[in-house]
Amino acid sequence: MIIMKLIFLGTGAAVPSKNRNHIGIAFKFGGEVFLFDCGENIQRQMLFTEVSPMKINHIFITHLHGDHILGIPGLLQSMGFFGREKELKIFGPEGTKEIIENSLKLGTHYIEFPIKVYEIYTKEPITIYKEENYEIIAYPTEHGIPSYAYIFKEIKKPRLDIEKAKKLGVKIGPDLKKLKNGEAVKNIYGEIIKPEYVLLPPKKGFCLAYSGDTLPLEDFGKYLKELGCDVLIHEATFDDSAKDAAKENMHSTIGDAVNIAKLANVKALILTHISARYDKEEYFNLYKMNVKQYNESFKIIISEDLKSYDIKKDLLG
């Protein structure tokens, strides 16, 4: 069983507070660790969690405001200091390459490992990275500058109907693996058995979405529903009484995030990117006031710095 965890390294907005660092979210999927946004001080936050900078091979930047990128220079320098050799892939909107190039000019450093930067220019949802068992989709959002939400989608292989394969005379052993991988084999009678004869549709894979900073976008919610999104991490910078401030600054409120989650039909919504104007208790009380009117069936969680979630146990269970 693949281990999937979310670790919130920072959950604050433009200005950090005593309780909330600048934004940064780590997602563990098996042996992979993905970092979504990298605000100031993120590498120190990692020291209090199970996240190792050396295990991060992919960084996804939603947009180029400082609270989402100012942790990159220090993180890269620490990776170099500890002798990293493996390539690091960084994805982000137009201008990301220049940010990374400038980061490498700051001070004396030991960065000798390869860094590959992928800039995103799309105005439509598009797969920006794909492996055998997952893909990452970028979805354009609205925040005044080029910005993207990111969607992690697990890819499941078709299942093998072993009993049917036996009845068709397939040898138990390597031939079953070949069929599962899409290769035809010969049965004990010398007949060709094609994969489609014995393969069942794959089970639905896990799907996670992170909004980044954005105005509420109904089309985003509808798109996530089409994908079968399970968990949505959505910014909720302001409470519902500050709708004008949210709109003016191109952010979302608690209610906005809940509405998008409802459209997406998710199992869990995690609110993050919370303004420093609220202390921890105040935001929680406003949240309770705001969500009373919604009475939704999905879980709603307020993110906290250094809090981790086992996705299957804590969010989908």
UniProtKB/Swiss-Prot annotation:
<keyword id="KW-0540">Nuclease</keyword>
<feature type="active site" description="Proton acceptor">
    <location>
        <position position="67"/>
    </location>
</feature>
<protein>
    <recommendedName>
        <fullName>Ribonuclease Z</fullName>
        <ecNumber>3.1.26.11</ecNumber>
    </recommendedName>
</protein>
<comment type="similarity">
    <text>Belongs to the RNase Z family.</text>
</comment>
<dbReference type="InterPro" id="IPR036866">
    <property type="entry name" value="RibonucZ/Hydroxyglut_hydro"/>
</dbReference>
<keyword id="KW-0862">Zinc</keyword>
<dbReference type="Pfam" id="PF12706">
    <property type="entry name" value="Lactamase_B_2"/>
</dbReference>
<dbReference type="InterPro" id="IPR013471">
    <property type="entry name" value="RNase_Z/BN"/>
</dbReference>
<feature type="binding site">
    <location>
        <position position="65"/>
    </location>
    <ligand>
        <name>Zn(2+) 1</name>
    </ligand>
</feature>
<feature type="binding site">
    <location>
        <position position="143"/>
    </location>
    <ligand>
        <name>Zn(2+) 1</name>
    </ligand>
</feature>
<keyword id="KW-0378">Hydrolase</keyword>
<comment type="subunit">
    <text>Homodimer.</text>
</comment>
<feature type="binding site">
    <location>
        <position position="273"/>
    </location>
    <ligand>
        <name>Zn(2+) 2</name>
    </ligand>
</feature>
<dbReference type="GO" id="GO:0008270">
    <property type="term" value="F:zinc ion binding"/>
</dbReference>
<keyword id="KW-0479">Metal-binding</keyword>
<keyword id="KW-0255">Endonuclease</keyword>
<feature type="binding site">
    <location>
        <position position="67"/>
    </location>
    <ligand>
        <name>Zn(2+) 2</name>
    </ligand>
</feature>
<feature type="binding site">
    <location>
        <position position="63"/>
    </location>
    <ligand>
        <name>Zn(2+) 1</name>
    </ligand>
</feature>
<feature type="binding site">
    <location>
        <position position="68"/>
    </location>
    <ligand>
        <name>Zn(2+) 2</name>
    </ligand>
</feature>
<feature type="binding site">
    <location>
        <position position="213"/>
    </location>
    <ligand>
        <name>Zn(2+) 1</name>
    </ligand>
</feature>
<comment type="function">
    <text>Zinc phosphodiesterase, which displays some tRNA 3'-processing endonuclease activity. Probably involved in tRNA maturation, by removing a 3'-trailer from precursor tRNA.</text>
</comment>
<dbReference type="GO" id="GO:0042781">
    <property type="term" value="F:3'-tRNA processing endoribonuclease activity"/>
</dbReference>
<dbReference type="InterPro" id="IPR001279">
    <property type="entry name" value="Metallo-B-lactamas"/>
</dbReference>
<feature type="binding site">
    <location>
        <position position="213"/>
    </location>
    <ligand>
        <name>Zn(2+) 2</name>
    </ligand>
</feature>
<keyword id="KW-0819">tRNA processing</keyword>
